[in-house]
């Protein structure tokens, strides 16, 4: 099919090349042979009057022209895809749909286990690809690279729909042998003690607790940085270090790991975890169904207490 002299199939090839940055991988992703993909590149170059890609080792490096074209091409293809899919009837019992979801280790442990267990009973053909939050959520949603992103609402993209899932709050935790946690922490003690902190992604972006602490003037002396909250409890054992963690995750680990829990020197407001999806998925029947499942399971979650009960 052609539009103003352009074979629209070439846009599919261009999108695959921008995504995979490899001729072989791009060809495989859209079921083309490598020679056919090479021919598509030649035709794209002729039509746009630009090289579009150069080789650096085995990687394709897009030119500024290709980078400028990529968002419009992806948006056009997604509009076509979801305009067609949205009209298909979705039967979760028979579906083999695989949902691609970006989420934190906190949500994985305290919430998503419920979802997986429920669907194993009600929709056993449904699968998941659960991936860490490592990239900019706005970019992930814009390019339709995920079905859902679950993240603190403070970090949610303003360009895509969202729904609140659950509330959480931050507490201070340490080893049961940490004597400084036997009393209410002062600002001075909290700031002077060694901390373990979580940061995320390739660039180690600050997590929700770092944002809230700085927003309210609480500073820490960070001695250890880990790529997720779930790695913190084992590293507290046998040390005088402390950490600031979401209470729901602390409650999860407290079942198996000895922890001393204390209130922060300043009560911080609760924060919400939200689910987002690409705006183009709004009418996709499978996406609508999964949103309902997520929201239903979130309603069954208990509300975290307003204050922390001291644990010796």
Curated annotation (Swiss-Prot):
Keywords: Activator, DNA-binding, Nodulation, Plasmid, Repressor, Transcription, Transcription regulation. Transmembrane segments: none annotated. Residues 6-63 form the HTH lysR-type domain. Gene3D superfamilies: Periplasmic binding protein-like II, Winged helix-like DNA-binding domain superfamily/Winged helix DNA-binding domain. Residues 23-42 bind DNA. One of its GO terms (molecular function) is DNA binding. SUPFAM superfamilies: Periplasmic binding protein-like II, Winged helix' DNA-binding domain. It comes from the Bacteria. Belongs to the LysR transcriptional regulatory family. NodD regulates the expression of the nodABCFE genes which encode other nodulation proteins. NodD is also a negative regulator of its own expression. Binds flavonoids as inducers. This is Nodulation protein D 2. It comes from Bradyrhizobium japonicum. The gene is nodD2.
């Amino acid at each position: 099919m052609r539009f103003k002299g352009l074979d629209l199939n070439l846009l599919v090839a261009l999108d695959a090349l921008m995504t995979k940055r490899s001729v072989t991988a791009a060809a495989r992703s859209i079921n083309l042979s490598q020679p056919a993909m090479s021919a598509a590149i030649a035709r794209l170059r002729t039509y746009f009057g630009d090289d579009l890609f150069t080789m650096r080792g085995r990687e394709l490096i897009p030119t500024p022209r290709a980078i400028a074209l990529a968002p419009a091409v992806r948006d056009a293809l997604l509009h076509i895809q979801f305009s067609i899919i949205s009209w298909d009837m979705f039967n979760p019992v028979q579906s083999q749909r695989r949902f691609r979801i970006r989420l934190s280790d906190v949500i994985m442990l305290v919430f998503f286990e419920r979802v997986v267990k429920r669907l194993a009973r009600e929709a056993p053909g449904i699968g998941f690809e659960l991936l860490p939050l490592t990239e900019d959520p706005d970019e992930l949603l814009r390019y339709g690279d995920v079905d859902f992103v679950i993240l603190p609402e403070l970090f949610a993209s303003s360009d895509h729909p969202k729904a609140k899932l659950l509330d959480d709050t931050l507490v201070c935790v340490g080893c049961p042998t940490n004597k400084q946690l036997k009393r209410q922490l002062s600002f001075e003690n909290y700031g002077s003690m060694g901390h373990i902190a979580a940061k995320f992604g390739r660039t180690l972006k600050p997590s929700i607790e770092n944002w809230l602490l700085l927003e309210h003037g609480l500073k820490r002396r960070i001695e250890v940085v880990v790529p997720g909250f779930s790695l913190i409890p084992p590293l507290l054992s046998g040390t005088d270090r402390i950490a600031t963690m979401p209470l729901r995750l602390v409650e999860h680990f407290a079942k198996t790991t000895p922890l001393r829990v204390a209130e922060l020197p300043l009560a911080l407001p609760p924060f919400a975890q939200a689910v987002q999806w690409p705006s183009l998925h709004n009418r996709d029947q499978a996406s609508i169904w999964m949103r309902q499942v997520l929201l239903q399971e979130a309603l069954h979650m208990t509300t975290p207490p307003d204050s922390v009960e001291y644990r010796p």
